[in-house]
Design a protein with these regions (language model features):
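Aromatic-rich, lipid-facing transmembrane alpha helices and their immediate juxtamembrane interface loops
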Residues: 1-280
Length: 280
């Protein structure tokens, strides 16, 4: 809840923060368990609780960040702009916060929750545990599938841009077969940008029509093939757009600070499509 509130304030929009569609954040649940286990031998020392909680939670955050980036090719958090960070996955300020949270968990939160649970009948607790576990498992499986599909979409958009650039280069070669005085009538095709694919397609269509009427007859077949390949890329683009369903949109909106080293341009394109980059 606190992170969703924090991000909502930063982005000035209501944000359901996290990897899952529901309100649960696995890293915090896992972090709490790790904190409890790691600090068990030093329960009498606040300094020991702070230090061991800091170290254990930082290790968990680093490992989780590396694994998620490897799987999904995106970062759900990035501390690269923070001082004393390691590969952007962890940083000093975050680690210090983990230490403070560990103290709060051990000294304030956990004792009260334990006392509350002791007052609730065991069969009620067990039933609640079963229901929550089932809901969590379904949400996790669905969210994992959406995240993997998002990675494939980002890869497809990147490949689409690369293919479009190759066809653009072929267009330039065909344009060279036209006399210099006629080239101005054809126009030029700008480099394809993932965030401006529609404009690129319009530019291509107009230029190819002009090129077809001006190239030597022996080159018209090449222009026709080029038009067909551009049309195919358009179909691929539409197919990619249809894969952006509700769950993937929720995933992006719930993580507006999502970054990707490998697919940065493609990710920015998707963010623009759903209105996340309007203020940039």
């Amino acid at each position: 809840i606190w992170e969703s509130s924090y991000v909502s304030i930063l982005t000035k929009r209501l944000t359901n923060r996290g990897f899952l569609t529901g309100p649960m954040l696995p890293i915090y649940g896992s972090g709490a368990v790790v904190m409890l286990c790691a600090t068990y031998p030093v329960q009498s020392s606040d300094v020991g609780i702070f230090l061991l909680g800091l170290i254990a939670a930082t290790i968990l955050e680093y490992v989780t960040g590396v694994v998620m980036e490897t799987l999904f090719q995106v970062r759900y958090w990035d501390y690269s702009d923070k001082k004393f960070n390691i590969q952007g996955h962890i940083c000093l300020s975050s680690s210090l916060a983990w230490g403070v949270f560990t103290l709060l968990l051990i000294r304030v939160v956990h004792p009260r929750i334990s006392a509350l649970l002791e007052k609730i009948p065991q069969n009620v607790c067990f039933s609640a545990l079963v229901v929550i576990t089932i809901v969590f498992a379904i949400d996790f499986a669905s969210s994992f599938h959406a995240a993997m599909d998002l990675r494939q979409i980002l890869e497809s958009i990147t490949n689409l841009k690369s293919d479009a650039e190759k066809l653009r280069e072929r267009f330039i070669v065909l344009t060279d077969s036209v006399s210099e005085t006629l080239r101005d009538k054809i126009g030029t095709i700008k480099k394809p940008e993932s965030s401006r694919i529609e404009e690129f397609q319009t530019s291509v269509s107009e230029c190819l029509e002009k090129l077809y009427s001006l190239v030597p007859k022996e080159k018209t077949a090449d222009v026709i093939r080029l038009k067909e390949r551009f049309a195919y890329l358009g179909e691929l683009k539409n197919a990619i757009s249809k894969r952006m369903d509700f769950r993937k949109i929720i995933l992006l909106k719930g993580n507006p600070m999502l970054t990707s080293k490998k697919y940065a341009d493609a990710l920015n394109s998707l963010k623009e499509q759903i209105g996340l980059n309007k203020n940039k």
